[in-house]
Amino acid sequence: YSTQYIIQIGVIEIESNKKDSLFWNTNRLIPLTIEESADYSRKDSIYTVRNSKKYLDSIDAKGNKFKLGKVLTGYTFKNSAEKYSLSYEGLLNIGSLSFNTVQGYNFDSGFRFTSTKNQESKGIYTAVSTKFNYGFAEERLRVTGQFLHRFNKMNYATLSISGGSSVKQFNPNEPISKVINTISSLAFRNNFMKLYNLEALAISYSQDIANGVHLNGKVEYQQRKPLFNNTDFSFLNKSDLYSSNNPLDLNDFTTAPVDKHHLTKATLNARINFGNNYSSRPDGKFNIRNEKYPTLYLGYEKGFASNEKKYEFDHLNTRLTYDLILGSKGVLGLNLKAGKFFNAENIAFMDYKHFNGNQTHIGQSERYLNVFNLLPYYSNSTNNSYFELHSEYNDKGYIMNKIPLLNKLKSTLNLGFH
Protein backbone atom coordinates (compact mmCIF):
# COMPACT_ATOMS: atom_id res chain seq x y z
CA TYR A 1 0.00 0.00 0.00
CA SER A 2 1.82 3.07 -1.28
CA THR A 3 1.55 6.56 0.20
CA GLN A 4 2.94 8.14 -2.97
CA TYR A 5 -0.36 9.65 -4.06
CA ILE A 6 -1.74 10.64 -0.63
CA ILE A 7 -2.43 14.36 -0.41
CA GLN A 8 -3.42 16.46 2.59
CA ILE A 9 -5.73 18.91 0.88
CA GLY A 10 -6.13 21.30 3.80
CA VAL A 11 -5.21 21.80 7.43
CA ILE A 12 -6.64 24.03 10.16
CA GLU A 13 -4.54 24.25 13.30
CA ILE A 14 -5.95 23.68 16.78
CA GLU A 15 -7.53 26.82 18.31
CA SER A 16 -6.83 28.80 15.13
CA ASN A 17 -10.24 30.42 15.54
CA LYS A 18 -9.30 31.65 19.03
CA LYS A 19 -6.30 33.78 18.07
CA ASP A 20 -6.52 37.41 19.19
CA SER A 21 -6.42 40.47 16.93
CA LEU A 22 -2.72 41.05 17.66
CA PHE A 23 -1.87 37.64 16.17
CA TRP A 24 -3.86 38.29 13.01
CA ASN A 25 -2.55 41.83 12.59
CA THR A 26 0.97 40.42 12.73
CA ASN A 27 0.48 37.35 10.53
CA ARG A 28 -2.22 38.34 8.04
CA LEU A 29 -0.53 39.34 4.78
CA ILE A 30 -3.46 41.42 3.56
CA PRO A 31 -5.38 43.44 6.18
CA LEU A 32 -9.14 43.05 6.40
CA THR A 33 -11.24 45.80 4.91
CA ILE A 34 -13.60 47.75 7.15
CA GLU A 35 -16.53 45.83 5.67
CA GLU A 36 -14.86 42.46 6.32
CA SER A 37 -14.02 43.38 9.91
CA ALA A 38 -17.61 44.46 10.52
CA ASP A 39 -18.93 41.24 8.98
CA TYR A 40 -16.69 39.05 11.16
CA SER A 41 -17.70 41.00 14.26
CA ARG A 42 -21.39 40.63 13.42
CA LYS A 43 -21.07 36.88 12.78
CA ASP A 44 -19.14 36.38 16.03
CA SER A 45 -21.88 38.17 17.94
CA ILE A 46 -24.61 36.08 16.32
CA TYR A 47 -22.68 32.87 17.04
CA THR A 48 -22.21 33.85 20.69
CA VAL A 49 -25.91 34.60 21.15
CA ARG A 50 -27.18 31.50 19.35
CA ASN A 51 -24.87 29.23 21.33
CA SER A 52 -25.58 30.76 24.73
CA LYS A 53 -27.32 28.56 27.29
CA LYS A 54 -30.17 31.03 27.68
CA TYR A 55 -30.93 31.05 23.95
CA LEU A 56 -30.60 27.28 23.53
CA ASP A 57 -32.80 26.58 26.57
CA SER A 58 -35.51 28.86 25.19
CA ILE A 59 -35.50 27.03 21.85
CA ASP A 60 -35.58 23.63 23.58
CA ALA A 61 -38.41 24.66 25.89
CA LYS A 62 -40.70 25.12 22.90
CA GLY A 63 -39.86 21.77 21.32
CA ASN A 64 -39.78 19.83 24.60
CA LYS A 65 -43.40 20.51 25.51
CA PHE A 66 -45.01 17.18 26.37
CA LYS A 67 -48.59 16.31 25.47
CA LEU A 68 -50.48 13.13 26.30
CA GLY A 69 -50.76 12.28 22.61
CA LYS A 70 -46.97 11.96 22.45
CA VAL A 71 -47.32 8.61 24.23
CA LEU A 72 -48.80 7.31 20.99
CA THR A 73 -46.95 9.37 18.38
CA GLY A 74 -43.51 9.65 19.98
CA TYR A 75 -41.55 12.29 21.86
CA THR A 76 -38.06 13.81 21.81
CA PHE A 77 -36.43 15.74 24.64
CA LYS A 78 -33.42 17.87 23.73
CA ASN A 79 -30.88 19.70 25.84
CA SER A 80 -28.89 21.64 23.27
CA ALA A 81 -26.68 23.36 25.84
CA GLU A 82 -25.51 20.02 27.26
CA LYS A 83 -25.69 18.44 23.79
CA TYR A 84 -27.82 15.39 24.48
CA SER A 85 -31.24 14.14 23.46
CA LEU A 86 -33.66 11.37 24.43
CA SER A 87 -36.25 10.14 21.96
CA TYR A 88 -39.18 7.73 22.15
CA GLU A 89 -40.72 6.38 18.94
CA GLY A 90 -44.27 5.97 20.26
CA LEU A 91 -46.82 3.16 20.24
CA LEU A 92 -48.24 4.27 16.89
CA ASN A 93 -45.02 4.16 14.91
CA ILE A 94 -46.90 3.84 11.62
CA GLY A 95 -43.76 4.16 9.54
CA SER A 96 -42.46 0.87 10.95
CA LEU A 97 -45.66 -1.11 10.32
CA SER A 98 -45.08 -4.03 7.94
CA PHE A 99 -46.35 -7.53 7.15
CA ASN A 100 -44.77 -10.94 6.69
CA THR A 101 -46.22 -14.43 6.91
CA VAL A 102 -44.22 -15.34 10.02
CA GLN A 103 -45.15 -12.38 12.23
CA GLY A 104 -48.20 -11.12 10.40
CA TYR A 105 -48.53 -7.40 10.99
CA ASN A 106 -45.64 -6.14 13.08
CA PHE A 107 -44.30 -2.78 14.17
CA ASP A 108 -41.36 -1.24 16.01
CA SER A 109 -41.00 1.18 18.87
CA GLY A 110 -38.05 2.12 21.01
CA PHE A 111 -35.92 4.60 22.91
CA ARG A 112 -32.69 6.33 21.94
CA PHE A 113 -30.23 8.48 23.88
CA THR A 114 -27.49 10.42 22.09
CA SER A 115 -24.74 12.64 23.43
CA THR A 116 -22.45 14.89 21.39
CA LYS A 117 -21.08 17.00 24.25
CA ASN A 118 -17.49 16.85 23.00
CA GLN A 119 -18.39 16.54 19.32
CA GLU A 120 -17.00 19.90 18.22
CA SER A 121 -13.66 19.63 19.99
CA LYS A 122 -12.92 15.90 20.01
CA GLY A 123 -15.54 14.22 17.83
CA ILE A 124 -16.83 12.08 20.69
CA TYR A 125 -20.27 10.60 20.07
CA THR A 126 -22.32 8.23 22.24
CA ALA A 127 -25.63 6.53 21.52
CA VAL A 128 -27.67 4.04 23.54
CA SER A 129 -30.78 2.61 21.93
CA THR A 130 -33.32 -0.14 22.33
CA LYS A 131 -35.92 -1.40 19.87
CA PHE A 132 -39.12 -3.30 20.55
CA ASN A 133 -40.71 -5.34 17.76
CA TYR A 134 -44.11 -7.00 18.17
CA GLY A 135 -45.62 -9.51 15.74
CA PHE A 136 -49.39 -9.88 16.03
CA ALA A 137 -49.73 -13.31 14.36
CA GLU A 138 -46.94 -14.70 16.54
CA GLU A 139 -48.10 -12.77 19.59
CA ARG A 140 -44.44 -12.29 20.38
CA LEU A 141 -42.35 -9.33 21.51
CA ARG A 142 -38.68 -9.13 20.56
CA VAL A 143 -36.22 -6.65 22.07
CA THR A 144 -32.78 -5.54 20.90
CA GLY A 145 -30.37 -2.97 22.31
CA GLN A 146 -27.15 -1.26 21.30
CA PHE A 147 -24.42 0.85 22.88
CA LEU A 148 -22.21 2.78 20.45
CA HIS A 149 -19.31 5.08 21.31
CA ARG A 150 -17.05 6.92 18.90
CA PHE A 151 -13.87 8.03 20.63
CA ASN A 152 -12.76 10.68 18.12
CA LYS A 153 -12.90 11.84 14.53
CA MET A 154 -9.17 11.58 13.91
CA ASN A 155 -9.07 7.81 13.36
CA TYR A 156 -12.81 7.26 13.96
CA ALA A 157 -12.22 4.62 16.66
CA THR A 158 -15.68 3.20 17.43
CA LEU A 159 -16.88 0.57 19.90
CA SER A 160 -20.27 -1.10 19.61
CA ILE A 161 -22.01 -3.61 21.89
CA SER A 162 -25.37 -5.00 20.82
CA GLY A 163 -27.68 -7.88 21.58
CA GLY A 164 -31.20 -9.17 21.81
CA SER A 165 -33.78 -11.16 19.89
CA SER A 166 -34.87 -10.38 16.32
CA VAL A 167 -36.09 -11.89 13.06
CA LYS A 168 -33.55 -11.89 10.25
CA GLN A 169 -33.57 -12.69 6.56
CA PHE A 170 -31.33 -15.61 5.56
CA ASN A 171 -29.45 -13.17 3.36
CA PRO A 172 -27.82 -10.69 5.80
CA ASN A 173 -27.90 -8.01 3.07
CA GLU A 174 -31.71 -8.12 3.39
CA PRO A 175 -32.46 -7.58 -0.34
CA ILE A 176 -36.22 -7.62 0.26
CA SER A 177 -37.39 -4.43 1.93
CA LYS A 178 -40.23 -4.54 4.43
CA VAL A 179 -42.35 -2.23 2.27
CA ILE A 180 -41.91 -4.28 -0.90
CA ASN A 181 -42.58 -7.55 0.92
CA THR A 182 -45.70 -6.12 2.55
CA ILE A 183 -47.16 -5.07 -0.81
CA SER A 184 -46.19 -8.26 -2.65
CA SER A 185 -47.64 -10.40 0.15
CA LEU A 186 -50.92 -8.61 0.82
CA ALA A 187 -51.71 -7.82 -2.84
CA PHE A 188 -50.20 -10.77 -4.73
CA ARG A 189 -49.55 -13.42 -2.03
CA ASN A 190 -45.87 -13.48 -2.96
CA ASN A 191 -44.15 -13.79 0.42
CA PHE A 192 -40.55 -13.64 -0.82
CA MET A 193 -39.10 -12.72 2.57
CA LYS A 194 -37.82 -15.80 4.44
CA LEU A 195 -36.95 -15.40 8.11
CA TYR A 196 -35.31 -17.09 11.07
CA ASN A 197 -35.08 -16.15 14.74
CA LEU A 198 -31.76 -14.78 15.97
CA GLU A 199 -30.75 -14.28 19.59
CA ALA A 200 -27.33 -12.68 19.69
CA LEU A 201 -24.73 -10.77 21.67
CA ALA A 202 -22.02 -8.93 19.73
CA ILE A 203 -19.08 -6.62 20.31
CA SER A 204 -17.31 -4.80 17.49
CA TYR A 205 -14.51 -2.27 17.15
CA SER A 206 -13.40 -0.26 14.13
CA GLN A 207 -10.96 2.51 13.29
CA ASP A 208 -8.72 3.94 10.58
CA ILE A 209 -5.31 2.28 10.99
CA ALA A 210 -3.64 4.28 8.20
CA ASN A 211 -4.70 6.93 5.73
CA GLY A 212 -7.38 5.36 3.54
CA VAL A 213 -7.32 2.05 5.46
CA HIS A 214 -10.26 1.23 7.75
CA LEU A 215 -10.33 -1.95 9.87
CA ASN A 216 -13.37 -3.53 11.54
CA GLY A 217 -13.44 -6.52 13.88
CA LYS A 218 -16.47 -8.24 15.39
CA VAL A 219 -17.20 -11.22 17.64
CA GLU A 220 -20.79 -12.39 17.96
CA TYR A 221 -22.52 -15.24 19.77
CA GLN A 222 -25.63 -16.35 17.87
CA GLN A 223 -28.45 -18.74 18.65
CA ARG A 224 -30.53 -19.53 15.57
CA LYS A 225 -34.03 -21.02 15.51
CA PRO A 226 -36.32 -21.86 12.57
CA LEU A 227 -39.60 -20.03 12.09
CA PHE A 228 -42.81 -21.05 10.31
CA ASN A 229 -45.73 -19.21 8.74
CA ASN A 230 -48.34 -18.08 11.26
CA THR A 231 -50.85 -16.30 9.02
CA ASP A 232 -52.58 -16.78 5.68
CA PHE A 233 -54.03 -13.27 5.48
CA SER A 234 -54.04 -11.12 2.34
CA PHE A 235 -56.23 -8.49 0.69
CA LEU A 236 -56.27 -9.98 -2.81
CA ASN A 237 -55.77 -13.31 -4.61
CA LYS A 238 -57.09 -15.21 -1.61
CA SER A 239 -57.40 -18.42 -3.63
CA ASP A 240 -53.62 -18.55 -4.13
CA LEU A 241 -51.33 -20.16 -1.59
CA TYR A 242 -48.43 -18.54 0.21
CA SER A 243 -45.09 -20.33 -0.07
CA SER A 244 -43.54 -21.81 3.06
CA ASN A 245 -40.89 -20.04 5.13
CA ASN A 246 -38.33 -22.61 3.95
CA PRO A 247 -36.08 -21.04 1.27
CA LEU A 248 -34.72 -24.52 0.42
CA ASP A 249 -38.17 -25.89 -0.45
CA LEU A 250 -40.98 -23.38 -0.90
CA ASN A 251 -43.63 -26.14 -0.87
CA ASP A 252 -42.49 -27.80 2.37
CA PHE A 253 -44.50 -26.38 5.27
CA THR A 254 -43.34 -28.85 7.94
CA THR A 255 -39.56 -29.21 7.54
CA ALA A 256 -37.38 -26.51 9.07
CA PRO A 257 -34.68 -25.01 6.82
CA VAL A 258 -32.26 -25.15 9.78
CA ASP A 259 -32.19 -26.89 13.13
CA LYS A 260 -31.91 -24.91 16.34
CA HIS A 261 -28.23 -24.38 17.11
CA HIS A 262 -25.72 -21.85 18.39
CA LEU A 263 -22.49 -20.55 16.90
CA THR A 264 -19.85 -17.92 17.61
CA LYS A 265 -18.70 -15.87 14.62
CA ALA A 266 -15.60 -13.71 14.35
CA THR A 267 -15.13 -11.36 11.40
CA LEU A 268 -12.29 -9.10 10.35
CA ASN A 269 -12.84 -6.68 7.47
CA ALA A 270 -10.61 -4.06 5.87
CA ARG A 271 -11.50 -1.25 3.47
CA ILE A 272 -8.71 0.35 1.44
CA ASN A 273 -9.34 3.60 -0.44
CA PHE A 274 -6.35 3.91 -2.75
CA GLY A 275 -5.04 7.44 -3.28
CA ASN A 276 -7.17 8.69 -0.39
CA ASN A 277 -6.93 12.43 0.27
CA TYR A 278 -7.90 14.12 3.51
CA SER A 279 -8.38 17.43 5.27
CA SER A 280 -7.28 18.03 8.87
CA ARG A 281 -9.22 20.23 11.27
CA PRO A 282 -9.15 20.60 15.05
CA ASP A 283 -12.35 18.55 15.31
CA GLY A 284 -11.19 15.70 13.11
CA LYS A 285 -9.71 14.24 9.99
CA PHE A 286 -12.04 14.18 7.00
CA ASN A 287 -11.33 11.67 4.27
CA ILE A 288 -11.85 12.69 0.65
CA ARG A 289 -11.95 9.68 -1.63
CA ASN A 290 -9.91 10.00 -4.81
CA GLU A 291 -12.24 8.91 -7.62
CA LYS A 292 -9.29 8.06 -9.86
CA TYR A 293 -8.61 4.95 -7.78
CA PRO A 294 -10.69 1.91 -6.77
CA THR A 295 -11.75 0.79 -3.30
CA LEU A 296 -10.71 -2.67 -2.14
CA TYR A 297 -12.45 -4.70 0.58
CA LEU A 298 -10.87 -7.73 2.26
CA GLY A 299 -12.70 -9.99 4.70
CA TYR A 300 -12.26 -13.08 6.84
CA GLU A 301 -15.11 -14.80 8.68
CA LYS A 302 -14.83 -17.76 11.05
CA GLY A 303 -17.60 -19.77 12.66
CA PHE A 304 -16.55 -21.66 15.79
CA ALA A 305 -17.63 -22.87 19.25
CA SER A 306 -20.86 -24.35 17.92
CA ASN A 307 -22.92 -27.02 19.65
CA GLU A 308 -22.23 -29.15 16.55
CA LYS A 309 -18.90 -29.22 14.71
CA LYS A 310 -20.59 -29.30 11.29
CA TYR A 311 -21.69 -25.66 11.63
CA GLU A 312 -18.13 -24.34 11.96
CA PHE A 313 -16.37 -22.88 8.91
CA ASP A 314 -13.88 -20.39 7.46
CA HIS A 315 -14.72 -17.87 4.75
CA LEU A 316 -12.38 -15.56 2.82
CA ASN A 317 -13.86 -12.82 0.64
CA THR A 318 -12.84 -9.76 -1.32
CA ARG A 319 -14.56 -6.98 -3.26
CA LEU A 320 -13.38 -4.24 -5.61
CA THR A 321 -15.48 -1.21 -6.55
CA TYR A 322 -14.51 1.39 -9.12
CA ASP A 323 -16.10 4.18 -11.13
CA LEU A 324 -14.20 4.75 -14.37
CA ILE A 325 -14.78 8.37 -15.36
CA LEU A 326 -14.96 8.62 -19.16
CA GLY A 327 -14.97 12.39 -19.30
CA SER A 328 -17.99 13.75 -21.18
CA LYS A 329 -18.84 10.22 -22.36
CA GLY A 330 -20.16 9.09 -18.97
CA VAL A 331 -19.24 6.73 -16.16
CA LEU A 332 -18.59 2.98 -16.09
CA GLY A 333 -19.24 1.48 -12.66
CA LEU A 334 -17.74 -1.86 -11.60
CA ASN A 335 -18.36 -4.10 -8.59
CA LEU A 336 -16.36 -7.34 -8.45
CA LYS A 337 -16.68 -9.93 -5.66
CA ALA A 338 -15.04 -13.26 -4.99
CA GLY A 339 -14.78 -15.65 -2.07
CA LYS A 340 -14.10 -19.15 -0.86
CA PHE A 341 -15.47 -21.28 1.99
CA PHE A 342 -13.38 -23.87 3.80
CA ASN A 343 -14.65 -26.83 5.88
CA ALA A 344 -18.20 -25.70 5.14
CA GLU A 345 -19.92 -28.77 3.69
CA ASN A 346 -22.73 -28.85 6.29
CA ILE A 347 -22.95 -25.29 7.56
CA ALA A 348 -26.27 -23.58 8.30
CA PHE A 349 -28.05 -21.97 5.36
CA MET A 350 -27.84 -18.43 6.79
CA ASP A 351 -24.02 -18.72 6.68
CA TYR A 352 -23.98 -19.40 2.93
CA LYS A 353 -23.01 -16.72 0.46
CA HIS A 354 -26.30 -15.35 -0.85
CA PHE A 355 -26.65 -13.20 -3.96
CA ASN A 356 -28.98 -10.23 -4.00
CA GLY A 357 -31.85 -11.19 -6.29
CA ASN A 358 -35.10 -9.42 -7.13
CA GLN A 359 -38.26 -11.39 -7.89
CA THR A 360 -40.52 -8.36 -7.45
CA HIS A 361 -38.97 -6.62 -10.50
CA ILE A 362 -39.28 -3.31 -8.68
CA GLY A 363 -36.06 -1.33 -8.67
CA GLN A 364 -35.02 0.02 -5.30
CA SER A 365 -31.89 2.00 -6.16
CA GLU A 366 -30.52 4.47 -8.69
CA ARG A 367 -27.66 2.14 -9.63
CA TYR A 368 -27.75 -1.64 -9.94
CA LEU A 369 -24.20 -2.56 -9.02
CA ASN A 370 -25.10 -4.95 -6.20
CA VAL A 371 -28.16 -6.85 -7.41
CA PHE A 372 -29.31 -9.36 -10.03
CA ASN A 373 -32.74 -8.05 -11.00
CA LEU A 374 -33.96 -11.35 -12.53
CA LEU A 375 -32.45 -13.78 -10.01
CA PRO A 376 -34.54 -15.71 -7.45
CA TYR A 377 -33.36 -14.80 -3.98
CA TYR A 378 -31.83 -18.13 -2.92
CA SER A 379 -31.43 -20.16 -6.12
CA ASN A 380 -27.65 -19.71 -6.37
CA SER A 381 -26.65 -19.57 -2.70
CA THR A 382 -23.38 -21.40 -2.12
CA ASN A 383 -21.04 -22.70 0.57
CA ASN A 384 -18.16 -23.13 -1.88
CA SER A 385 -16.18 -20.71 -4.05
CA TYR A 386 -17.90 -17.92 -5.98
CA PHE A 387 -17.31 -14.95 -8.27
CA GLU A 388 -19.69 -12.07 -8.87
CA LEU A 389 -19.53 -9.21 -11.38
CA HIS A 390 -21.71 -6.15 -11.83
CA SER A 391 -21.06 -3.37 -14.33
CA GLU A 392 -23.17 -0.42 -15.37
CA TYR A 393 -22.57 2.31 -17.92
CA ASN A 394 -24.30 5.70 -17.58
CA ASP A 395 -23.81 8.00 -20.57
CA LYS A 396 -24.59 11.13 -18.47
CA GLY A 397 -26.51 12.42 -21.49
CA TYR A 398 -23.64 11.96 -23.98
CA ILE A 399 -25.77 9.76 -26.28
CA MET A 400 -29.31 10.72 -25.29
CA ASN A 401 -28.69 14.44 -25.74
CA LYS A 402 -27.89 13.81 -29.42
CA ILE A 403 -31.25 12.14 -30.19
CA PRO A 404 -33.98 14.57 -31.37
CA LEU A 405 -37.00 14.86 -29.07
CA LEU A 406 -35.46 12.52 -26.49
CA ASN A 407 -32.91 15.21 -25.70
CA LYS A 408 -35.78 17.34 -24.39
CA LEU A 409 -36.30 14.84 -21.56
CA LYS A 410 -32.80 15.38 -20.10
CA SER A 411 -32.60 11.60 -19.69
CA THR A 412 -29.58 9.30 -19.52
CA LEU A 413 -28.85 5.91 -21.04
CA ASN A 414 -27.97 3.06 -18.67
CA LEU A 415 -26.54 -0.26 -19.82
CA GLY A 416 -25.78 -3.04 -17.35
CA PHE A 417 -23.98 -6.37 -17.43
CA HIS A 418 -24.17 -8.86 -14.55
Give the positions of each predicted feature:
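Short, surface-exposed basic-aromatic patches at helix termini and helix-loop junctions that form
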Residues: F147-K153
